[in-house]
Amino acid sequence: MPEAVIGLDVGKLSHWACVATRDGEILLSAPVANREGDLDSLFGRFPDALVVVDQSRNIGALALARARAAGMSAAYLPGLAAHGAARLFAGDAKTD
């Protein structure tokens, strides 16, 4: 089981990265450019984390490819699951 999860809300030019530990501690919550070097830098900071994206094709493909190239476990969170998870939090729950 990974020590942390890197959740990426993927976008065309940049993604929002949130890194959380198993205990729920947020280690990072910041944008990361959708470029190989920027993604590699993020993944290099947390090499043992599980990478999860909310879109696996097109704009999410580079993030998945770079995570796998770094030897990291990577997964896709389908839309219905993301929507269900967003409902767990109070306030505005926006899902793509």
Specify the residue positions occupied by each region the protein language model found.
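Phosphate- and other anionic-substrate recognition elements at nucleic-acid/protein interfaces
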Residues: 1-96
